[in-house]
Amino acid sequence: MDIKCLNWFESKGENRALFLKARDRNNDSVFIKFEHNYYYVVRESTKNELTIVPKYSKCLGDMNIVNIDERVITNTAVKNYVPENSTLWLIAHPSKLVIKEELMAEFLNITWFFLINNIVPDGCFRLNTDYLTLIRKGCYFCNNPELCFKNPIPRFDVSKTYLYFDIECQFEKKFPSVFTNPVSHISCCYIDKFNKEYKFTIVNKELLSQEELDKAGDILQIDTVNEMDYDADIVLCSEITLLRIVKKLLELSFDYIVTFNGHNFDIKYLSTRLTILTNEYILFKTPDKAEAVRLCVYERNLASHKGAGGMANTTYHVNNNNGTLFFDLYAYIQKTEKLDSYKLDSIAKHAFYCKSVACPDKNGNYMFVGNNSTDAKGKAELFSAVLATGNYITINDHVCKVVRKEIYPSEFKVVLDMKNAFTPITNETYELSFGKDNVSLSDMYKNFTLVTAIEMANYCLHDAVLCKHLWKHYGIETKIDAAAATYILPQCLAFEYRASTLIKGPLLQLLLETKTVLVKSGKQKKLPYEGGRVFAPKKKMFTNNVMIFDYNSLYPNVCIYGNLSPETLVSVVVSSNRLEYDINLKQLKKKFPQPNYILVECEPRSEDLISEVAIFDRQQRGIIPKLLLNFLDKRAKYKKMLKEAENSSDKEIYDSMQYMYKIIANSVYGLMGFRSSVLYSYASAKSCTSIGRSMITYLDSVLNGAKLVDGFLELASNPTNPFFGGFGKKEISTSIDPSITMNFNSVYGDTDSVFLEVDSKDVETTLVVAKELEKIINSIVLFDNFRIEFEAVYKNLIMQSKKKYSTLKIAAGSKNADSAVRINKGTSETRRDVSKFHKCMIKKYKTQLSDTLSAGILTDKQVCVDTLKSLELDLMLEFEMRQSPLEMFLLSRTHHCNYKLNDNPNMALVNKYNSENVEAIEIGERYYFAYVCPETLPWQKKLTNIKTFERIVDKSFTLDGERIFYEIYFKRLATEIVNLLDNKVLSTQLFEKLFGTKPIFYS
C-alpha cells in the first residue's frame, strides 16, 4: 500500500493513541492507529533497577554526557573537562514511569516516535501490510511502525478536501451575544477530493417576515438537514436546521477547515448556539470510533509572552480528534506579517491588488481593465479569481461598488460606481485592491428584507472565499508540510509551538547522530548582554546615492566561525581590574593559541568586573554550528531544487522548505540567549553579538574612505582578520570602466548592514559599481564563511535617527531607477498610534524633501528654512480654518487591565465611558480617542496634563462647543519633522515660537 502522510494526531482520552491520516494512490483516506508511548532515556544501571518491564527498549550505545554549565573563573588555571561516557537506553511505555535519573527529558514524545521509527512526518511510504491489522474500513492498527514504514518512496500528489466558511450574526450593539442573537448566515466554500467546488450560503429564514418569504420564488427552502442541496447558491431554513447542517459539515473528516478568526468567534459561536437551542453538541470521533469528544475551543494564555498593551498572548485551539486540521488565518497572519491592521479588509487589500486602465462607462460609471499588459504576469489572473465573488473595490482609498464585471482567464473588466469617489482620467493606470465590503451590517439588520438577506449573503460568501484565496496566497498548505518535516512534528502542531520547542526535533536528531547528551544543573540565571552595533547616522539628508550591503546570515555564520556552542566553551575568565585583565589575556593567548581556539572579549556580566573573556575550542565542530550548517546546507539544497523545479507544485514545496530552514537557522541565536531554551548558553549568545559587532566594525573600517580611481579600488585600510590577523591587499584591480571615479563614505550601520554614500546620483552607474564591490568584498576583504550581499541603492535617503529612515529603494536586481519603491522603516507611517493627519503631513514633507534632494539646487540650510516656513504656515492655516474632519485626528489603543497602577488614566477614561454608555468597551477591544478642548481656548504654547483632554470617540460623538486640541498633534508632528532636518538652531527657534519649549532631538 502506497500512502502520503497528511496529518498525525493524538486521541487524549483514557486510552491514548496516535493516529496517522493519509491518502493512497487512489486518493482514498487511510487512517493508521499506533500505540501511544512515553519515552525515557536512562543509564543502563537505572534501566536494570526498574520494577516495571517497559513495553519497548532500545540501546542507544555509548554516549558522551556533557555538562554545559558555564565554568567562570578569575584566573587562567582552566581545568580540562572530560565528559562522562555511558551506555544509555531508550525505553518506552504506554503509561508514565517514575524515573529517578532521566536524561533528555526536554524532548517531545512524538519526536522520539518519528526518529526511532525513521518516519518523515510528511513523507510518502510503501507500507508493509504484514504489520497492519484492519480495525474497520479505512482504519488499521500498526504493531511495528519501524518495519511497516521501512520503505520511503518518491513523493506523489494527492488532492485534499477543504471547508472555508464565514458567519454573520444578528446584532443590535457592537457585538452579538450568543444567548440572544441568532446566526443569520453561514457561507461555505467546500472542495471535495475530486476538486469539485461548492459555494453556498444558508440564510436563517426566521429573521424574515412571511411576506418576504413569499417573494423567495425559486430560492430553495428546506425544513430538515436531509433536504440540503449543496449545489444551491442560497438556501433558506430555520436557525436550528442551519446549525445542524453546520454540525454535519464540521463533523466530516475534511483535511482542512479554514476560517478567519474562527477559533475565537465563529466556531465557538456556532457550537454554543447549537447547544443552547437543541442541547446537541458537535462531536468528533477518532477514526476507529473508540472515542468521541465534544467540540471545545480552549485558550492558551502565556503571560510570559505579553503582546501589545501588556496583554497576555492568547491562542485558541480546537480539540478535535478526527484528523481534520482546523486553521485560523487571523492567528497565522498576525504572527507572521507586520501590518497596520489585521482586519480581513486590510489583509485582503495587502494581498490582492492589480493595476488597471480606466475608461468611461454608462451613467457616470467607469470601467477598469486589467491584464498581463497592465501589471506583472499573473496579477490579473489572481485578481480575477478574487473578483468573482467581490462586491466592492478599493481605489485611491475610496471603496467603490461593483456595478458589473467580466472575468476571463488572464483579464478582467470591472465597472465601478465612482460617483462618491473621484473622476478617473481616461487611459490612466490605477491600482485596484480588495477590501471588506462597504456595508453597514447594523443598518441592514434593522431593515432585514429578502433583498437585504441576499446582499448580505453575497458579502458573507465573499469573506468565505477570501479565506480560500488567502490560504493559497500565503502558501500555507506547503508551509505546514515543510514545518512538519523540518521540526519533526505532526502537521497539526507545526505552527502551535514557539521557536524554543520547534528547535527540539532537529536538535534531538543531531544529538542522537553525534552520540551526545547535554545536561545542565538547576534554573539558569537571567543575565543581560549587549546586542548588535548600531552606528549613529552621520547626517539627516542625502542627495547622493547610498549603497546598502548586508551580511548573509551574520549570526549563524558567527556561530559557525567561532564554533560557539555550550559544550565547546572551555571557560569564561573574568577580571576585576586592568592589571589582572592584562595578565590574564596574555597568558590565555599562550595557553589557547589561535586558530585552534578563539578568545572572545565581551562586556562584563556585573558592575564589579571590568572584563570577560570567553574561550571556545574550534578543533571539533560543536552542536550549534553543526545544527546551523545542517540548516544552511538544506536551505541551499532546496533553493537549488526550487530553481530547477519544472511544475508549480514542486516550486511551492521547495520554496516553503527553504523558507522554513531560513527561519529556524535565524532563530538559533535568540535561543542561545533564552534561558528556558534547551540551547541556552549565555557565553555563546554574548560572544555571538561581540563577534558580530567586530565584523560590522571591520567592514566599516575597510570601506569608509575607500576610493575608485582608474579601474582600481583603494580600500580605506588593509583587510585584516580582526581575530587572527593577516594582511590583504589595499589596492585591488576591478573590471569597472576606468573613467568612473567614485568615493565611498560609511554613513550608517545597523547590526549586519552598512550604508555607503557615494559621490554620484547616477543610479545605473551606482548599481554596476555596487555589484563589483560585492565581489571584491567577498573574495578579498572577508574570510572563512562570512559573505555580504549588495541589497539595494537608496536614493534621496532621509535618516530620522537610528533605525528610522525613509527612502526610494532600487533593488540590487534592477537596471535603473524606474523600479524605485518608497519605503519607510520605523517611522510614523508604519505605526498604529499615529493620527491620519500626522501620517498625511509627514508623507507630504518627506515627498517635498525627497524632491528637493533630487533637484540638488538648495543648500541644507535653505532646505531647512523652506521646510520650517512651510510647516508653520500649514499648521497655522489648519488651526485657523479647521478644515480637516475629526477622523483625521483619531488615535487608537487596546483596552486592557495590565496597568501597574490602579488609577491609570487610560483605565479611568474607559471606565467613565462605560458608565455613561450602553455599549461598553470590552477588555481586548481597540477604541478610538482624540484630544479635545473648549472651542474658545486660544492657541496653547504650554501643554500640560494632556491626558485630561482625551475623549473616547464613537459613532455618536460630536464636537459640541469644543475643538480638536490641535497643539498636541502639531507638536508631535513638528517633533518628527525637525528630526528630518540638519539645522538644530532653526528648528529650536520654530519650536520655541510655537510651543514655548525646545524640541526633543532623537539620539
Task: Indicate where each model-derived feature is located.
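Intrinsically disordered, low-complexity acidic Ser/Thr-rich regulatory segments
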Residues: 225-236, 305-322, 384-385, 396-397, ...
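Non-transmembrane amphipathic alpha-helical segments
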Residues: 628-645, 661
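Short beta-strand
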Residues: 404-405, 745-750, 790
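Common nucleic-acid-contacting/processivity interface regions adjacent to the catalytic cores
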Residues: 359-389, 397-399, 417, 424-435, ...
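Conserved DEDDh/DEDDy metal-dependent 3′-5′ exonuclease domain
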Residues: 45-53, 59-100, 211-340, 346, ...
